[in-house]
């Protein structure tokens, strides 16, 4: 049964993509209907698959000597990621029925979205590193194509190309790691690597560990390779929700969690993961606070929340990281889709041009506030329980300075959350009025996600059991729901974190009385608005690379004689090395 459900989770979206592509552009109603049907069916299949969690390979197809076996494994991490991709993905497709109603090239949009969803499900369920890499690259292509969906907009095209290039840097790290593993044990199977990782030479394991970390940094938009994600905001809003909540950015966190047992003892690796996570959490939160574009603010918020998950993995809290991944997928999809309803109604992303829209859009205001409650980590919302689990574990298992930095990040998160609510829905009305609240299809998705914000934390016990029973190499601490609640209430770190969050709210409330403090912080504000110079740093690397390539270009004379000399000389060197047994 699990074989069928896994194939349906991956294959149904891909089958839908093919059928929709073959329909042609004129069958718009049919495209909406089929995209919804196939995505929802895949979501249902993934939901049922949660009941078949196992660490055994249930589907194996031999692909020959060089490619190894294509395997699918329904373990806890895989079925969980597949469920997020397909269920949240199906809600974005339902939302798109209204949001994309007037858009041209609807066929291309739905085909790419469904291909994206299926690839993400395949990435999670794959038992082979090589085929995980294949699905990894398909998601990269889909993100590029969807970010560049409005291909007559130079900013959208540039954003898509940037996302593709940066994430390909991470893909190189994953591919190198996979090839090294194959060279060591003769297999691409993830289970084989986790079983034999302790036998690897230290320098080989270090190469794999930091290669996978580089892959995660690029894919999950962590500092310093985070700059592609804010530029991805040129995509249609359902696409940004898909990228930021249900699909691609989750892949890097999943990669680190998947291979944590094999890599955790590599010298310097866990502290590197912690530092990457806390820098991303703090710096991105500050950039979200300084942003006036609602979608860019939410993009920086995504980077920050992913930083919490990466930090959690660095401290060994694999369960907490994945639990927060679930919470974040829900409340961030809710926030992006709510913001999309606002943007479509008022025609701008600039929060400075909004204000008092809550009177015109009471439904959207309510669901956006629900999303911010979860983002800020207030009690009763899923974000509270998952974030507090991370902070509680970090209090015990990470350096104290790292824990304090994450606490500060929690306060900044509360600050920019209330800032977004205030600028969009309250205060003085600017020169924009909303034309509608939210059409029916949008309301279905937004209502479902709002309900999930208040209920998914009840799955903590079942989710913990799923992971612990199907991940033999991981040490998963399981808690029942009542134990989770009592544990968090009793933990001093919980109350300290809530105090920091409260201080964040107070800062915004008292902002007019703190103008002198804001004046003293102006250098930090300017640095934040400049993105802390990461874009300039990345551009500097590009310029150095271009300069080096111009030097190497001298060797390309274009003369056949010299080309033949180079080929023959290189062949002689290779043959000599082979003869010496190198």
Spell out what each predicted region is:
Residues 28-39, 159-168, 359-367, 436-451, ...:
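Alpha-helical transmembrane segments and their helix-start/interface "positive-inside/aromatic belt" motifs
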Residues 58-66, 189-196, 389-393, 463-486:
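Membrane-interfacial helical/loop segments at transmembrane boundaries in membrane proteins
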Residues 37-50, 170-179, 369-375, 445-463, ...:
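Hydrophobic alpha-helical membrane-insertion segments
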Residues 1-8, 15-111, 183-202, 206, ...:
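Transmembrane helix-loop-helix hairpins at membrane boundaries of multipass inner-membrane proteins
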Residues 72-86, 202-217, 405-410, 482-503:
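Hydrophobic alpha-helical transmembrane segments
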Residues 463-496, 502-582:
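Aromatic-capped, Gly/Pro-kinked transmembrane alpha-helices
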Residues 91-132, 141-438, 455-458:
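Hydrophobic transmembrane alpha-helices and their helix-loop junctions in integral membrane proteins
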Residues 1-8, 70-84, 122-134, 269, ...:
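Membrane-entry segments of alpha-helical transmembrane domains in multi-pass membrane proteins
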């Amino acid at each position: 049964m699990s074989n069928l459900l896994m194939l349906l989770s991956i294959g149904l979206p891909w089958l839908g993509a093919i059928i929709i592509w073959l329909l042609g552009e004129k069958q718009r109603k049919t495209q909406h209907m089929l995209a919804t049907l196939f995505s929802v069916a895949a979501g249902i299949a993934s939901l049922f698959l949660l009941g078949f969690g196992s660490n055994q390979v249930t589907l194996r197809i031999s692909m020959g000597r060089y490619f190894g076996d294509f395997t699918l494994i329904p373990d806890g991490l895989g079925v969980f990621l597949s469920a997020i991709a397909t269920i949240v993905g199906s809600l974005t497709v339902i939302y798109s029925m209204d949001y994309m109603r007037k858009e041209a090239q609807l066929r291309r949009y739905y085909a790419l979205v469904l291909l994206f969803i299926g690839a993400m499900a395949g990435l999670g369920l794959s038992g082979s590193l090589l085929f995980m890499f294949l699905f990894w690259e398909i998601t990269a292509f889909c993100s590029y194509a969807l970010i560049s969906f409005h291909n007559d907009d130079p900013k959208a095209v540039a954003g898509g190309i940037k996302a593709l290039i940066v994430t390909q840097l991470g893909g190189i790290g994953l591919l190198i790691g996979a090839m090294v593993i194959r060279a060591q044990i003769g297999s691409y199977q993830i289970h084989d690597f986790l079983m034999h990782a302790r036998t690897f030479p230290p320098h080989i394991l270090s190469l794999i560990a930091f290669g996978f970390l580089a892959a995660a940094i690029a894919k999950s938009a962590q500092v310093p390779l985070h700059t592609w994600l804010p530029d991805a905001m040129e995509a249609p809003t359902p696409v940004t929700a898909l990228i930021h909540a249900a699909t691609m950015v989750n892949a890097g966190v999943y990669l680190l969690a998947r291979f944590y047992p094999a890599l955790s003892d590599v010298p310097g690796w866990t502290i590197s993961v912690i530092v990457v996570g806390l820098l991303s959490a703090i710096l991105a939160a500050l950039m979200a606070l300084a942003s006036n574009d609602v979608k860019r603010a939410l993009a920086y918020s995504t980077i920050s929340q992913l930083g919490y998950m990466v930090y959690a993995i660095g401290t060994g809290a694999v369960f907490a990281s994945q639990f927060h991944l679930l919470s974040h997928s829900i409340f961030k999809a809710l926030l992006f889709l709510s913001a999309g309803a606002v943007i479509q109604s008022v025609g701008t992303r600039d929060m400075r041009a909004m204000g008092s829209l809550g009177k015109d859009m009471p439904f959207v205001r309510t669901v956006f506030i629900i999303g911010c409650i979860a983002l800020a980590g207030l009690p009763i919302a899923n974000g509270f329980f998952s974030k507090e689990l991370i902070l509680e574990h970090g209090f015990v298992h990470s350096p104290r300075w790292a824990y304090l930095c994450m606490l500060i990040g929690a306060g900044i998160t509360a600050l920019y959350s209330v800032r977004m609510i205030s600028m969009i829905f309250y205060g003085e009305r600017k020169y924009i009025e909303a034309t509608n609240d939210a059409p029916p299809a949008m309301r279905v998705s937004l209502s479902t996600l709002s309900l999930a914000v208040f209920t998914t934390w009840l799955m903590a016990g079942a989710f913990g059991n799923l992971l612990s029973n199907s991940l033999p190499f991981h040490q998963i601490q399981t808690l029942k729901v009542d134990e989770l609640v009592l544990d968090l209430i009793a933990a001093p770190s919980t109350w300290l974190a809530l105090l920091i969050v409260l201080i964040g709210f107070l800062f915004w409330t008292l902002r007019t009385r703190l103008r002198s403090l804001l004046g003293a912080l102006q250098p930090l504000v300017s640095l934040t608005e400049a993105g802390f110079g990461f874009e300039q740093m990345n551009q500097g690397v590009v310029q150095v690379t271009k300069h080096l390539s111009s030097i190497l270009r001298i060797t390309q004379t274009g003369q056949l004689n010299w080309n033949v000399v180079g080929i023959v000389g290189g062949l002689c060197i290779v043959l000599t090395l082979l003869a010496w047994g190198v």
